[in-house]
Amino acid sequence: MYVHIDNFLVYLRVEKNASPRTTESYQKDLFHGLDYFASRLGKEDHAIVPSDIDHRIFRHYLAHMQKQGLARATMARRLAAWRSFYRYLYREKIIDGNPLLRVASPKLEKRLPRFLYEDEAKELVEAPDTKQPLGMRDRALLETLYAGGLRISELVLLDLGDLDISSGYIRVTGKRARERLVPLGSMAVEALQAYLAKARPRLMANSVAKKINNALFLNCRGERLSARGIRKILDKYVEKVSLERKISPHTLRHSFATHLLNAGADLRSVQELMGHVRLSSTQVYTHVTGERLKKVYRKSHPRAKG
């Protein structure tokens, strides 16, 4: 089984352009299942072949995870990893049939995306001290994240060449290497101009390697800023402005979509700006805005009270 899993991970990296984090997640979930199947079948894990695992064993696996008290989302994710793996095995003609076609995934509760209100988003992105180089960088970073509705992985990958500051556009490389052009508002452009002119050269001077680094956002050592580094920066300013709930970089992306729809943007345009392949991925934000409007109605309309 290990050979097939290794080949599948290569397929994800090379053909599906999956990120290292994604392939690592798949590997972890597949190995978790493999440990259970080895125990269930009374075999060494390296001796298991795909045909050893039928739909009954997959159902036992689900029951086992349920007994462990795992969240439905965790169970569904692990099963989804095995679904993808077995679809790959079937396409490669390694198995004759897919046993997971007979296994239902756990039903998940639909959770609405968390977002910031407009005044909260404004307070957060304006929190950095722009008198300092790192503050200039942080302001530009937060403005770009919010103004462009970027995923954290997209922000990390931005290079200087992706930014057309004069036109106010940024080229974003999304999932599966799909590119899109995203407009930036005047505030994001101003923050980026200040960062590029005054702060980035000083951060670049700190580079130990003394090599040209094309990354748009740099850390204090003049290296490309990592996803972990961006999360730390966001956490710092969330604490500074005392937002009393959990905020992630994706919260700013959710806020971007919600605020556009609240202001009357059409769904197709928001879909394109966010880089969603399916409209259904964008439609979830209409539920968010719908819930907000419902609360306003119930609070304000005389016939809704009581």
From Swiss-Prot:
A GO term from the CC aspect: cytoplasm
Gene encoding the protein: xerC
Main location: cytoplasm
Domain of life: Bacteria
Catalytic-site annotation from UniProt: R151, K175, H250, R253, H276, Y285
Binding partners and assembly: Forms a cyclic heterotetrameric complex composed of two molecules of XerC and two molecules of XerD.
Domain Core-binding (CB): 1-90
All residue ranges annotated as the Tyr recombinase domain in the record: 111-298
HAMAP family in the record: Recomb_XerC_XerD
Family annotation (InterPro entries): CB, DNA_brk_join_enz, Integrase-like_cat_sf, Integrase_catalytic, Integrase_recombinase_N, Integrase_SAM-like_N, Recomb_XerC, Tyrosine_recombinase_XerC/XerD
Entry annotated with the keyword Cell cycle: yes
GO molecular function list: DNA binding; tyrosine-based site-specific recombinase activity
Subcellular location: Cytoplasm
UniProt keywords, alphabetically: Cell cycle, Cell division, Chromosome partition, Cytoplasm, DNA integration, DNA recombination, DNA-binding
Organism the protein comes from: Pelotomaculum thermopropionicum (strain DSM 13744 / JCM 10971 / SI)
UniProt keyword Cytoplasm, yes or no: yes
GO biological process: cell division; chromosome segregation; DNA transposition
Protein name (database record): Tyrosine recombinase XerC
Function: Site-specific tyrosine recombinase, which acts by catalyzing the cutting and rejoining of the recombining DNA molecules. The XerC-XerD complex is essential to convert dimers of the bacterial chromosome into monomers to permit their segregation at cell division. It also contributes to the segregational stability of plasmids.
Family as reported in the entry's similarity comment: Belongs to the 'phage' integrase family. XerC subfamily.
